[in-house]
Amino acid sequence: MAPNFPPIEEALPLHHDLFYDGKWQTPITDSRRETLNPSTGQVIGKIADASTTDVDKAVEAAHKAFLSWKKTTMAERQGYMRRAAAILREHAAELALVESYNTGNPVAAMVIDAERAANALDYFAGLIPMLRGEVLPGPFPTEDYLHYTVREPMGVVARFVASNHPFMFAGARMASVIAGGNTVIIKPPEQAPLSCLRLAELLENVFPPGVVNILPGGAECGQALTCHPLVRKVSLIGSVATGKIIMRNAGSLMKQTSMELGGKNALIAFPDADIDHLVRSVAAGMNFTWAGQSCGSTSRVFLHDSIHDEVLARVVEVVRKGFRPGLATDPTTTMGSLISKAAQDRVLNYIASAREEGARLVTGGGMFDDLAGTPVEGGFFVQPTIFADVTPDMKIAREEIFGPVMSVLRWSDESELIRIVNSTNYGLTGSIFTKDLATAQRMIRQVEAGFVWVNDVCKHFLNVPYGGIKDSGIGRDECIDELFAYTNIKSVNINLGGATHLGSRLSQAGQISNT
């Protein structure tokens, strides 16, 4: 059954301020920034812009809350998180509507995001009992010493979420942090903060004050969070450029980071692939629904010479028929806009460079698609675009575009294929299409990526680690490793008595030191 979407006026957040310490707070300087509807380019309103002083106050509140939150029992923490999950499911339609209104993503495709965020909250609530240490054997009899470890929360964690699925990332990525006994400050994307503010309204009375905080803002807010001494870890879903800035700042303070960054992901098709399934997957893997704005998009498609022409022609047909750009809040829209005018200009510049470098434009290439219906005037739309005859040296084959542009490359030699696939600085995902298990296993071992699909694209599975290598990131999400990443391990040694005579013996054996 189709969701019952409320009028947009009823779904939008009432508050446009900062949310911390369990209250809505006016920025110290009352600084505001405009936020837009990308489908139309029109201003929705002005949102609070957190300053360094605001960040200081929010971090102090989060740290104060941490001192109590870390002492909550497993059952208490699970109760808070499961209540939050239930609220997200209850308000899925309105969250999707706000999200689409402020991101340009089609509302019909965004409803599932509330379920994904709620599932993550339930999942990590269930993993809280795994926050246990180990009893470890030492080099000498156990009657002399007891060795064990404990896992402890880190403190205040800052999580920066991306503009393609803001409230989903906010809800899902806070889960591991608070499950681990930490408090969290979420920085929404500056282009699209509204769904995160609505999320704060929904959770305002769920968690104790200061446990979950949401600070909209720009570069000053991000810099202040990264460099604040009481913020123990910083996590980003975003661009490589932003990730490197955060890592430099955090590294100077010996602060831990977790990064899910960009991708230039390869879809590799062998001659024996199921052609019908391959065609559908190539079209789906580019994530044209949200205008290609996904770090996991399979934007480089490597088609074997023997199937290249047939697959390319059929993919073009599917894309032309399957993606109808339009107003994001219209449930019949199947392709959204880009997030901003700057993003639209960037994508169009990549399209221009591809033409200049000799790639063959097969479909798209402009700001809207007459075959699929003209989007709303003023929106930041770009047609679903496919280039063929792409060579590895072209910009569109090497750099992440983060837009609806697919590069199709022809291949025949497997060793050369692998060299080209691995020639970028990215390593997030890869897809391999073949019916032969030996071929799949051979390619899995050779493709440089943190996550590889075989005969599939773009799917995430809770409890299966997701993340990249090389410039695509550090750390793994959506699994128990994500939970552990927001804890510290403390090692404990207890002298059980009567073991003082061991000191000289152990020192002589080189098995202890006094450093």
From Swiss-Prot:
Q: Which PROSITE patterns does this one have? A: ALDEHYDE_DEHYDR_GLU
Q: According to the record, what happens upon gene knockout?
A: Leads to the accumulation of stipitaldehydic acid.
Q: Which domain of life is it from?
A: Eukaryota
Per the UniProt record, which residue ranges are transmembrane? Answer: none
Gene Ontology molecular function: any one:
aldehyde dehydrogenase (NAD+) activity
Q: Where is the active site?
A: E260, C295
UniProt-annotated binding residues for NAD(+): G238, S239, V240, A241, T242, G243
Give any Pfam family that matches: Aldedh
Extract the InterPro entries matched here.
Answer: Ald_DH/histidinol_DH (IPR016161), Ald_DH_C (IPR016163), Ald_DH_CS_GLU (IPR029510), Ald_DH_N (IPR016162), Aldehyde_DH_dom (IPR015590)
- UniProt keyword list: NAD, Oxidoreductase
- Quote the pathway field: Secondary metabolite biosynthesis
The catalysed reaction is: an aldehyde + NAD(+) + H2O = a carboxylate + NADH + 2 H(+)
EC nos = 1.2.1.3
**Keyword NAD recorded:** yes
Q: What class of enzyme is it?
A: oxidoreductase
Family indicated by similarity? Belongs to the aldehyde dehydrogenase family.
Q: Which PANTHER family match?
A: ALDEHYDE DEHYDROGENASE-RELATED
Role: Aldehyde dehydrogenase; part of the gene cluster that mediates the biosynthesis of the tropolone class of fungal maleic anhydrides. The pathway begins with the synthesis of 3-methylorcinaldehyde by the non-reducing polyketide synthase (PKS) tropA. 3-methylorcinaldehyde is the substrate for the FAD-dependent monooxygenase tropB to yield a dearomatized hydroxycyclohexadione. The 2-oxoglutarate-dependent dioxygenase tropC then performs the oxidative ring expansion to provide the first tropolone metabolite stipitaldehyde.
* UniProt name for this protein: Aldehyde dehydrogenase tropH
Species: Talaromyces stipitatus (strain ATCC 10500 / CBS 375.48 / QM 6759 / NRRL 1006) (Penicillium stipitatum)
Q: Could you read off the lineage of the organism from its UniProt record?
A: Eukaryota, Fungi, Dikarya, Ascomycota, Pezizomycotina
